[in-house]
């Protein structure tokens, strides 16, 4: 919303006066007020901008917005130009005067002029846009802007520096998390083929001094991650330096990557390696100094081992020299020089011994060693006695920046330097991954030999050849892996295997085993993850294994080299290694005992951590490559895939993920429909044959439903009339279905955009919501897809959206606003009752139908099942992540639960179910969404409160020029909402409703649903139910010429069809060069992505809610059900009839026919191609009229049956008749029974029978005319006249009638009544108008 400010500086009073122009240039009303800010905690005043609005006839606080827009922009441009001129004109010679002015500024007073009817909204200052020294004095036309001073004596506060809010998306590769419905889950999970990535983002305010390092430091603290492993990039993936000022970047979205993926640097590194000279022509440079801290710790550990293992006299001199070099406090550079000299000496010693025979305890002579790497953290291998290229590492060897230090003598051993992997360009080696099995098994990452120089997840592996060599005295195994590729050849890093690997489950090691017979290699590497959080945050990882990492290495058997997934395989590998230790010598017995104790401790710690399942426990698979290489074990994430393979993986991942979601949803709904049909057949008391025929029809409809989903639809079945809207994901058209003539709103979404934005689930959610039978929700009629687009055909509401209504009317009266607020609250609460949060409530998402009632649209941002998704939900996201990383989460959770059940006080504080994703329009977002505090369903009522302010005041309270300013206003909502100004022309009830809706989350109105609004005084004494039932005429009823009138849509484009980008041939076929005909360069995996179960037709609708309602309404014991149902329908149609009569248009919903044949003839005439669009509405009315007639006829039949049944039950309830009936049905002689009743032994019973015979029941009198009764009376001619009149005669007659009761009922029931019942059931259960029309 544009605002205008005239800022004048008064030199006499040294104050700033804001003159607000409201089309009265001659009058300036100023109310000066002095503001002292001696208290530093007081919030500094912010320059208030005026909001000018609306129409004068509505007394809106905002006036002439569109007219003032250009003037405001021109004024601001002039202001900035004057500031820039003053800034550039100042020089260093004016520093003294500038300082004097700065001192005088401390006593300035701020005088602000405001009007009582003008809303004041805090706005962020524009100081970052002008580069200006705070000590320089500005011109007379520029406002005085001073920065906040830390001194308590400062009298003039100033604005805080404007913060430009930016989003930083954290992409962290994590381990898999498997939980049930009651477990805590993170807000967003994206399931990949082999991993799960947790994506979250932070909204951070950027000022003129914020650098990339500040942001990374903040995120590392928030997420408990290592700062060195985080890298900042822009939205295009370009790396940003740490000292770069982020406000200079135009984009406001950044990416923070943990454990930078350098796959894109692989080819560059390989090309660089191919250009290098051979190893014999290179020189070995000293190690780099970027690992100074790690090098010192390794040297200290090496010193401890050298003091314990000084057994070899031949190596004592070198050992003492290395000890002295390490013990003396010297710089890292000098230590590297000495180590380099030690390596040269070792080469000379071994070259002199090359002619002597070698044994298992001696070192072999390698080729000439030179360095051909120019990056740090290289990987090396020791030479083999038999071959210069075969590796052999000494016992207890340690790889230390290019040197292998012998454990026995401490003498460095020359190593063959293999070509570096692309990951060697990494500045720092990664530590132990977070939440991996090794992080809970103890041991510091700095003390772990295997993880010190192991590269993670960046090695492409296709074909490998490996040679292994073992010795008797040094039982260490070193592995060299060579990549064989038609384009290049490269050696992978070498990794020694030690006993400490069993303590860490071989994490971070590449283990290969060669099969020389089949010329194949079996590659086994464990799943690896990014670096872990800081060491201080993981207290549960014990330090008992810190010294075991430097023990002597062993040679595992071939079976132990092939690792398997799961805990059992790891235990089996450790047992195999223990067996190999027995045959390797007695020198490793002590180490075996220590490792066994460490393994037992690790098992206990692993059992505590039982709520996570890691991906290394997933079943392995086998894959044979192009060169005959067998990949056994887990999927190698380091393998480089081609573009075609990546496309296929993405397509399969998206397809199967969505396929099974929709399949399970359909199966659940189908089960509910079958249960409803079975219940209906039982309650309707249908005979077996009729029930089977009726259920057969329902099963046929279910089959047609599935067949229509598979058949699909095409765009050429619709005729595009005009474009009525355009959004971020597609376009909205007004279209007509060619075969039925339905006027629909056709929403087209581009698949590539939807998939790129990860909005596939949102589209499915929107479709599911529109399928619900709800009067406030726009219904979905059709849905289909082609190769490039998704299409949703919905009901068309010709009244336009509510935004257009507000733009035309300006403001509404309280009575008009009350009507629309009641319908909006009903629409939102109906979604909440289904467990759905809309999250995007704004005027443009409410539309008006042809009668003027509210309909809710656009459910793309809705969210379902917050309670099921988040479970217990911690208070903040940080606590949730800490609980997941904590090793004692399960025990703490169980203690908290037990304390809660027992009524204890030490209960962890859990909040209500909340969500954390930030969605919605900026002006209508609640503070908890902007502040990322978690929200519930009441966030929709905050947005509705903003809409209510627009109805009554004509403007949005948080409106600003940029989204960043809008967010700042929302975060400072208590200062922004000037209630005395906003509510000065409103009633007390309306003002109270606004204050309660725009309130903090716990105290916000609507926490208990719509009942809170019904009890509010603004709605309490008004006709809420009448408005909901449609008995009150809306304040605005659209006046349209036809069903395709788009006069109420401001964005309608009726002339240029070339901009619609519509192809009747579905533009989705394959081209000659790839997907979509774009050639090989235009291949996109999302172009041909078919979303399963997306096709939908209203003719195949299987409404579950309608079936459940009918099952309840068809209660034959209550004869008033149908009359109540009919009266409700009449009440609902009363309002529509009154509107048509008042408008002078009878409409097309009123037709009366004398016979059914006339209706059928008229129906067939409407199906002709020349019929208008209104014929569909006429046919619908005919069906409803026929439905009412069937109801009335069937109701009369049921009433007769119920009356007859009631008479029979009353007749059988008489105690005397029950006694006589029991005697008669025993099979005794009728004459003897009558004589016994007439004897003197039972005078009371005879008198009772005679007295009861004097008043026979009316039912028997009415039935005396029946032939069955006459025949039964003739069968007893010998009875006396007195006994013929008693109830015994009546009971005999009733017995004869009951024997043939079923047959008489079937004969008397006419075929017409039976047909009416079948037709009524079919119409009630499935209102399938399309199939009826085709008939």
Swiss-Prot record:
Region Disordered, annotated ranges: 1-70, 85-158, 276-447, 462-603, 1239-1313
Name of the protein this chain belongs to: Probable serine/threonine-protein kinase ndrC
Claim: Metal-binding is one of the keywords in the record: no
Chain intervals with Basic and acidic residues compositional bias: 567-581, 1287-1313
Domain AGC-kinase C-terminal intervals: 1020-1106
Domain (Protein kinase): residue spans on this chain: 718-1019
Gene: ndrC
Annotated organism of origin: Dictyostelium discoideum
Pfam families: Pkinase (PF00069)
Binding of ATP, residues: 724-732, 747
